[in-house]
A protein has these predicted regions:
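Short acidic, S/G/P-rich loop/turn micro-motifs used as interaction or catalytic elements
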Residues: 91
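Hydrophobic lipid-interacting interfaces of membrane-associated proteins
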Residues: 151-156
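Solvent-exposed edge beta-strands and adjacent loop segments
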Residues: 2-88, 126-147
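Short, acidic/charged, Gly/Pro-enriched secondary-structure junctions
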Residues: 94-126
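Intrinsically disordered, low-complexity terminal/linker regions enriched in Pro/Ser/Gly
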Residues: 160-163
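Hydrophobic alpha-helical segments of small multi-pass membrane proteins
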Residues: 105-111, 131-132, 147-149
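Generic macromolecular interface patches on structured domains
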Residues: 94, 157-158
Length: 163
């Protein structure tokens, strides 16, 4: 299978460690082709240590008279937040790109992030990058923390190993 970055990726079944998850940030920012977000210059982010994916559903609820006191609900919106931690690695294109966004605002923080799961599934996310922390203790390695926040609807592609 070929991923969004145009690379061939081998997939296997079974249980996997988190380090088997591949991810990339588009260092060219967010680009659109025919109204679709398309990555132009995807790069890995070297020395990333942690990746946590959260999905938030906007839920509307109401209490109809015929519900006999029971609440009804409907998920009307979704968003994805990916929280990441990394060591600052100067000279790595992905790491430098993220660190370079720490003082940026507005559309300068738009990008495209894609995740390739070990089973071959791929999640492509038009996003906003929010750098939340740089630095650390005097004897620690320079740290970097950031969030990838979905900006519009992501694309989910089932991989060849998916059921």
């Amino acid at each position: 299978m070929i991923n969004m970055a145009g690379e061939s990726v081998k997939y296997t079944s079974g249980v996997h460690a988190n380090y088997d998850i591949a991810f990339r940030i588009d260092t060219a920012g967010l680009n659109f082709t025919d109204g679709q977000a398309m990555p132009k210059s995807p790069k890995t982010i070297s020395d990333a240590e942690g990746l946590s994916i959260s999905i938030d559903g906007g839920v509307e609820e109401w209490n109809p008279m015929d519900g006999e006191g029971w609440t009804r609900r409907l998920v009307t919106a979704k968003s994805i937040t990916i929280s990441m931690t990394a060591k600052r690695n100067s000279g790595d294109p992905g790491n430098d790109y993220i660190a370079g966004l720490f003082m940026k605002t507005g559309s300068d923080c738009y990008s495209f992030f894609d995740i390739i799961f070990p089973n071959g599934d791929e999640l492509g996310i038009p996003c906003v990058v929010n750098v939340t922390s740089l630095g650390g203790d005097s004897t620690a390695i320079d740290a970097m923390e950031f969030e990838i926040l979905s900006h519009g609807k992501p694309e989910y592609i089932k991989g060849s190993a998916s059921v």
